[in-house]
Amino acid sequence: ANCKGKVIFTGQGKSGKIGASASSTMSSFGIPSFFVHPSDAPHGDSGSIQRKDVLIIISYSGNTPELQSVISHANRFGIKIIGCSSNKASTLLKHSDVKILLPKVREVGPTGMVPTSSTTLTLLYFNCLAVALMDKIKFSKSKFILFHSGGSIGKELLTCGQICLKGNKLPLINYKSNILK
């Protein structure tokens, strides 16, 4: 909440999808945020990550090779890194200004290898972080409508006063007027 710039998320694979979701959630309540895919970063997209921004990198292993160029870019420009991993000795956490160490969990399923439990835990962590940020910035329904005017949520938040025509904008005709004219 003290970030002077944008909150940028990155991650590869399932971690990237969680980062994209977390970014979308933050944007929906007014925190400027977006997702940069790590494979696009070394091809020009790293230019969207600026000195005042905060870069949140998510990687269960913390050693995902595709993230190295993003870490290097952040280090080169003095961009703060918040690293989220389940590996205390990871490259990611070694290069992070703020370290989020999530517990290692056993993946459910027949192989025990498909990211299921770990992705659920990571998504839950970032949803809880979003709720804490909403509380810190005193987020309310009246602020939510400013960023989320569409869909079912937007319809639920709109008031009649926001959508009804008023005053001389009302299409009024005299009751004696001919309908065909």
Question: What residue spans do the PLM features occupy?
Answer:
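Short, solvent-exposed beta-strand edge segments and adjacent coil->beta transition regions
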Residues: 167-170
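Glycine-rich phosphate-binding loops that contact phosphosugars or nucleotide phosphates
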Residues: 6-137
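The conserved cystathionine-beta-synthase
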Residues: 172-181
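Internal, active-site/partner-interface "lid" segment
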Residues: 94, 108, 135-165
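An N-terminal, well-structured beta->alpha segment
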Residues: 1-2
